[in-house]
């Protein structure tokens, strides 16, 4: 079974600081361009019993317990480094280009500049490499559903495909879904070192707080690499 190890390398520690600042600052992944506006509430995450949870429950611990269901065994070898160019989630009808996301001056993670693109955090591995690759997108934009509006409705076993600059495609299978108050973001589970190629999809969730201009939660989808397709010749 894939393991999320407790050790952290230098890159993971830097990323953890960044995302912790993001969660504490409350900048989120959807409020950009939506300040003080009413917006549609996305569907809640389909959290399995015993899984990563924070929705309609007592405050989630910093490092929630793993799902009681076994995660899918990675069946593909890790891939070489190659920048992601697009993402496809067949079960949601999602197809989106991918842009780069770095860190802002305040050490919080940048967010996509529109509601149609997905961002890859450049401080994380590329999809298919060893470790957790992090992709983020808005849940709403200008009061309308955006790329990851239905991310919380994903189920274990569904697939996510990421095309890469070298023409290859990394195929991931969802192993867990969690929804957390932004003040309880599971930094270690999302950014911590793992012994296989993994993917994390992040957006906002829960109700929209008109006073702060933000949704109150984060939704995280955890997935493992199960297949890779070579570039077409």
Can you say where each PLM-predicted feature lies in the sequence?
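Solvent-exposed, non-transmembrane regions of membrane-associated and secreted proteins
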Residues: 29-154, 164-166, 176-233
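Terminal targeting segments of Actinobacterial cell-envelope proteins
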Residues: 1-14, 38-42, 55
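Hydrophobic membrane-insertion alpha-helices, especially the h-region
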Residues: 17-30
């Amino acid at each position: 079974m894939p393991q999320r190890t407790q050790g952290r390398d230098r890159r993971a520690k830097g990323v953890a600081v960044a995302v912790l600042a993001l969660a504490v600052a409350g900048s989120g992944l959807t409020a950009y361009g939506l300040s003080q506006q009413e917006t549609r509430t996305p569907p809640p995450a389909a959290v399995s019993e015993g899984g990563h949870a924070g929705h309609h429950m007592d405050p989630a611990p910093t490092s929630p317990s793993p799902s009681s269901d076994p995660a899918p065994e990675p069946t593909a070898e890790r891939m070489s480094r190659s920048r992601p160019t697009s993402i496809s989630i067949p079960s949601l009808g999602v197809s989106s280009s991918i842009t780069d996301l770095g860190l802002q001056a305040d050490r919080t993670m940048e967010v996509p500049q529109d509601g149609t693109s997905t961002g890859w955090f450049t401080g994380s591995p590329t999809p298919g490499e060893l470790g957790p690759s992090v992709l983020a997108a808005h849940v709403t934009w200008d009061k309308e559903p955006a790329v990851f509006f239905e991310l919380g409705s994903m189920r274990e076993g569904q697939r996510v495909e990421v095309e890469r600059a070298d023409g290859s495609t990394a195929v991931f299978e969802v192993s867990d879904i969690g929804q957390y108050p932004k003040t309880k973001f599971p930094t270690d589970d999302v950014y911590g070192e793992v012994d296989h190629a993994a993917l994390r999809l992040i957006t906002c969730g829960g109700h929209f707080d008109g006073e702060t201009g933000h949704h109150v939660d984060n939704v995280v989808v955890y997935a493992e690499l199960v297949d890779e397709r070579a570039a077409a010749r």
